[in-house]
């Protein structure tokens, strides 16, 4: 009986409510991630049980089940080809910036708990009518697009008040937005690229509103051109317009920053995506930059 009572006391002691700083990671394929799990160093291969992750099921516009998911633990397999039906997660053979980001942000906040929410889809754009689309006032087809799938992801993630499974409700405090996107807008047309700044401002304002924190830190990843186009070397003819829009955004927003380490990255033969090592570098840089912004930008708990 004494042993049973002791065990019950231990379980009760450990099952306490936890406060988590929550980071949202979104964008298109270079946030989705083409890093290959087989390339990972040993310390990234093991699950990091202290960092919960909710990844919304990525689907195209008009499709159902976007944003389905469940809280999991950080590990390889949240890159491209990840799938969730809301009951089980099917991890893939790929990872994205979330992996090293989660490891690094946890190191930068050793006295706090961190959690990640991710929703991203390759080829998606902010410009209206371009590919799979984030434009909030979407009117094509049934009107469902990437913005809706993002909202579903948040709704599903925050619906679970016990994200670590210890039986106690947790407090989730939005702490930052990490956004790696813009290639599709830079590739589509000059008109779409020239509207990127306005579209980016609108989208980040909506993200902040959805997370109920108007001054939430935002870190952007700079898009870069591989130079692999056979005609003129430019994969994105209007890339400079989107790059300038990214610079303008962070100059005009005191709670935003741009990570430009991508300028040194090596692209895969497809001309769009990065190497496994570069995804690890990108995630770490995202973590370093968002941590710097957090001290100067107020955050509020999600209620």
Where are these regions (language model features)?
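Sec-dependent signal peptide recognition
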Residues: 1-7
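Short hydrophobic "helix-edge" motifs at membrane interfaces and signal-peptide entry regions
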Residues: 4, 17-18
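N-terminal signal peptide c-region/cleavage motif recognized by signal peptidases
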Residues: 12-15
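Cell-envelope and extracellular/periplasmic
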Residues: 18-302
């Amino acid at each position: 009986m004494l042993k049973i009572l002791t065990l019950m006391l231990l379980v009760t002691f450990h099952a306490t409510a936890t406060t988590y700083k929550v980071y949202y990671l979104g964008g298109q394929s270079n946030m989705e991630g083409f890093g290959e799990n087989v390339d990972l160093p040993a310390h990234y291969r093991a699950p990091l049980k202290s960092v919960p992750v909710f990844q919304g099921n990525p689907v195209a516009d008009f499709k159902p089940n976007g944003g389905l998911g469940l809280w999991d633990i950080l590990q390889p397999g949240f890159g491209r080809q990840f799938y969730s039906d809301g009951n089980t997660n099917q991890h893939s053979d790929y990872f994205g910036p979330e992996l090293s980001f989660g490891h690094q942000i946890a190191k930068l906040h050793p006295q706090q708990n961190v959690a990640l929410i991710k929703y991203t889809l390759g080829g998606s754009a902010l410009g209206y009518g371009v590919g799979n689309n984030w434009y909030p006032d979407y009117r094509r087809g049934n009107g469902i697009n990437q913005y809706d799938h993002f909202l579903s992801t948040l709704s599903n993630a925050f619906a679970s008040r016990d994200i670590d499974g210890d039986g106690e409700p947790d407090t989730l405090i939005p702490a930052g937005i990490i956004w790696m996107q813009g290639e599709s807008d830079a590739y589509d047309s000059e008109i779409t690229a020239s509207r990127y700044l306005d579209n980016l401002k609108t989208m980040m304002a909506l993200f902040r509103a959805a997370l109920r924190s108007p001054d939430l830190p935002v870190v952007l990843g700079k898009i870069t051109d591989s130079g692999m186009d056979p005609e003129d070397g430019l994969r994105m003819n209007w890339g400079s317009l989107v790059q300038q829009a990214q610079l303008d955004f962070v100059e005009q927003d005191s709670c935003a920053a741009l990570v430009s380490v991508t300028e040194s990255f090596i692209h895969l033969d497809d001309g769009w995506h990065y190497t496994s090592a570069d995804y690890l570098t990108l995630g770490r840089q995202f973590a370093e930059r968002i941590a710097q912004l957090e001290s100067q930008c107020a955050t509020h708990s999600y209620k």
